[in-house]
């Protein structure tokens, strides 16, 4: 049975000073916001992305803010590159890692009957296999830290139906179950695992879709809060789940969706 050691009780509950983190896909969107949120709380961070130019632009910005961030180019859909990434992280952080944020994801929007075998394998490799394998690779580092936290950036598509996203939804639903499994299996190693499921968030991934005024109105009509989310509304939850303040929270799937997943039949009462 895992115990809350003196070292955990003695840590500041609302600080990540002295902790280390790996955030995949950290050069834009939710990943970039997560890097900044964790760094603001004092964590040392390594992040990766496929686009070296964009990664270097982000790094210059973080260095100007005084954040402790290192970077490397990595396509996490490749098994060999994931292994090399974790070797790099282990070297930088001297064999210990407190936080793993599996953020990288892709979505191919098509009706189910139009999806190809290539669509399926690419989506699964990028979204699910990468999260599964990186969690495996990170386990000894997380265990060595004495207090580990894994956050899986999932989606409401893994909780409810979203049209045109059948493969994506399958990958995210499996990711949510992975979070529950790891939470139970690795609790004795003082490693917590939680999934965060956003609805539409203002990111480069959805900019083109949301530029269609009719589509945006439809999206905004679904959550009771009547709008899409901002990246910092996701990154703040991710950061909280990594804090000592969240030390008894594990195995949870938490939606950041303005109430989308709990919204039933809404109507205005008759006059």
Swiss-Prot record:
Binding site for substrate: 155
Entry binding sites for NADP(+): 22-46
pH dependence (UniProt free text): Optimum pH is 7.5 for quinuclidinone reduction. Optimum pH is 6.0 for 4-methylcyclohexanone reduction.
Keywords on record: NADP, Oxidoreductase
MF terms in GO: oxidoreductase activity
InterPro entries: NAD(P)-bd_dom_sf, Sc_DH/Rdtase_CS, SDR_fam, TR
Active site residues of this protein: 168
Domain of life: Eukaryota
EC number in record: 1.1.1.-
Result for mutant: residue 209 to Y: Loss of activity with quinuclidinone and decreased activity with cyclohexanones
Pfam families the record matches: adh_short_C2
Keyword Lipid biosynthesis: no
Protein task: Oxidoreductase active on cyclic ketones, but not on tropinone or nortropinone.
Family from the record: Belongs to the short-chain dehydrogenases/reductases (SDR) family. SDR65C subfamily.
Protein name per its UniProtKB record: Tropinone reductase homolog At2g29360
Gene source species: Arabidopsis thaliana (Mouse-ear cress)
Taxonomy of the source species: Eukaryota, Viridiplantae, Streptophyta, Embryophyta, Tracheophyta
